[in-house]
Amino acid sequence: KKYQVIPEDNMAPVKSKLDFVNALEEFLDIWKQHTLILDTIKDSELGILLSEANMKETRDRNPQLSLLQLEKLLNTRIASRIKFLCTEKEENEKKRKLQEYRNYFHSAKNKWTEPQIYREFLLWLMKNNRLNNNDWEETLCHVKKGRFDLYDTAALCLIWKRILKKKDADEFSQIIIDEAQDFGVMIYYVMKQVLDTCYFTIMGDVSQNIRYETGMNDWEDLKKVLFQKE
């Protein structure tokens, strides 16, 4: 499917701010919690494969992983546990158990897309009257048509990073940005999250901000984003 990048819509002054991307992070965290049920996995023949505490520890120690990546890791651990517990069993029995628990965690079957999750997020904002603004109809309308402004596109990138990313890809080692003041701080937040091993050189002059409502009029929020404690 083809998508189109469009000029900033009327909600861009809201979408460009940290409050918007923080709300998106909250929504994606809820999405992950509702999807990834980490109850103890107990087999009637082999006993406990993975405990709730063990899986939650794995999740908490790997905050950089997307939902799909975390599911893959947990599935790998289930398979390893089965192989260990079946050490003295027949090969066919081990294969049967591995097949039984293959893709135990498998939200990929839902075939979610970034635009779909983004639409759900916008509806969530409206339903819960978040950000003191409920006027998301315009954004919803063009998103449904596959048309996204700069800040919608950044939101899609964060959704990919948190939910749908399947494997790590080659990343840039350094990115240099000039005239940084012309874009909202949420852009830099998303870049920092998606390119988490990259070095950024950011230059600009807030007195020359040509997009007063969406750009940056000071560096304070940007400093919070780039120098946040890990």
Describe every region a protein language model picked out:
Residues 2, 130-145, 160-174, 181-230:
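Conserved helicase motor core of SF1/SF2 NTP-dependent helicases
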Residues 2-40:
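P-loop NTPase motor core
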Residues 21, 153-156, 219:
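Alpha-helix initiation and N-capping motif
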Residues 24-28, 157, 179, 198:
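Generic hydrophobic, helix-prone segments enriched in Leu/Val/Ile
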Residues 31, 35-174, 184-188:
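Conserved helicase NTPase catalytic core signature
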